[in-house]
Amino acid sequence: MGKDTIADIITSIRNADMNRKGTVRIESTNITESIVKILLREGFIENVRKHRENNQYFLILTLRHRRNKKESYKTILNLKRISRPGLRIYSNSQRIPRILGGIGIVILSTSQGIMTDREARLKRIGGEILCYIW
């Protein structure tokens, strides 16, 4: 059985966010680096560092938390894996879904690389819907 690195990233970030952890350590691959760059650019995470340990590279993500008067921290990150190895979901540029009216983002794997739904609509290309983030 294969390893689903995108689901591992999503699960690690979601668990750290629910447990109010400040940092997450994930394996560094080309796909994970592309997804993390999108998360950083869209403001869902604060910082990314690349760490080397025993000839293996890891990404250390610093999560963004919002303070609330009633609670000490409020989680602001919701992630959902859409396309998975057993069931691939594809969409053309006209049918890419909008998450919460454009507040959330859809991460797509296209022929021109991994990008957000807005970038794919501007370039008028479709692809595999990897995950929703809001």
Curated annotation (Swiss-Prot):
The gene is rps8. It comes from Arabis hirsuta. SUPFAM superfamilies: Ribosomal protein S8. It is found in: Plastid, Chloroplast. Part of the 30S ribosomal subunit. Keywords: Chloroplast, Plastid, Ribonucleoprotein, Ribosomal protein, RNA-binding, rRNA-binding. This is Small ribosomal subunit protein uS8c. GO terms for cellular component: chloroplast; ribonucleoprotein complex; ribosome. One of its GO terms (molecular function) is structural constituent of ribosome. GO terms for biological process: translation. It holds the Pfam family Ribosomal_S8. It comes from the Eukaryota. One of the primary rRNA binding proteins, it binds directly to 16S rRNA central domain where it helps coordinate assembly of the platform of the 30S subunit. NCBIfam families: PRK00136.1. Gene3D superfamilies: 3.30.1370.30, 3.30.1490.10. Belongs to the universal ribosomal protein uS8 family.
